[in-house]
């Protein structure tokens, strides 16, 4: 299959292209059949020497079935030699297979995290409801149980009586070990 394509020449960072007719299997800058034009991208876009074409030779090769590449087809369309339409490939903008897998994993992780957070909120609500229910049950039990009647007796009298009993108990405790020692010996 014959192609009309660009063959790069020029130095590093200074490109210069030849427009050539070549077999599609030959290397980009390798063997070609005929040179049919030049392209110098360093010149301004409105410069006439930016693209030069041998129109008769190109028409002959197009008649023989040579297919221009996209870039060369643009140059030929500017000269009116071929009809060029902007390619529409919506698949080109889509992410690749691995990127789609990473996105799927990321969305799955996000969904799992959101589900875990929702579950934690539900568990917290359930625990709060149980605690509230337990508190209500405890309050109901406390209300149901008869409350001890507060004594109207003066508080000071029992405190003094308890104070008098405490020294007496201490004295008795001191005497008890002494009596035990004598019985053992």
From Swiss-Prot:
Bias (Low complexity): 126-146, 159-176
Composition-biased stretches (Basic and acidic residues): 89-125
Keyword Iron-sulfur set for record: no
Alphabetized GO MF terms: structural constituent of ribosome
Keyword NAD: no
SUPFAM superfamilies given in the database record: Ribosomal protein S16
GO biological process terms on file: translation
InterPro entries in the record: Ribosomal_bS16, Ribosomal_bS16_CS, Ribosomal_bS16_dom_sf
Region called Disordered, residue ranges: 83-185
Domain of life (superkingdom): Bacteria
Cellular component aspect of the GO annotation: cytoplasm; small ribosomal subunit
Family statement drawn from the similarity comment of this UniProt entry: Belongs to the bacterial ribosomal protein bS16 family.
Name by which UniProt lists this protein: Small ribosomal subunit protein bS16
Natural source organism: Caulobacter sp. (strain K31)
Gene giving rise to this polypeptide: rpsP
């Amino acid at each position: 299959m014959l192609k009309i394509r660009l063959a790069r020449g020029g130095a590093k960072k200074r490109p210069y292209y030849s427009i050539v007719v070549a077999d599609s299997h030959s290397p980009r800058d390798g063997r070609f059949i005929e040179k049919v034009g030049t392209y110098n991208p360093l010149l301004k876009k409105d410069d006439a020497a930016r693209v030069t074409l041998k129109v008769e030779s190109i028409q002959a090769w197009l008649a023989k079935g040579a297919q221009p590449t996209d870039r060369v087809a643009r140059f030929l369309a500017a000269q009116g030699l071929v009809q060029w339409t902007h390619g529409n490939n919506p698949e080109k903008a889509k992410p690749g297979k691995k990127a789609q897998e990473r996105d799927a994993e990321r969305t799955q992780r996000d969904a799992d995290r959101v589900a875990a957070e929702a579950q934690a909120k539900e568990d917290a609500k359930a625990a709060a409801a149980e605690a509230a229910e337990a508190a209500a049950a405890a309050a109901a039990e406390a209300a149901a149980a008869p409350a001890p009647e507060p004594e109207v007796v003066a508080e000071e009298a029992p405190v003094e009586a308890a104070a008098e009993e405490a020294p007496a108990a201490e004295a008795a405790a001191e005497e008890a070990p002494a009596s035990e020692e004598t019985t053992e010996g």
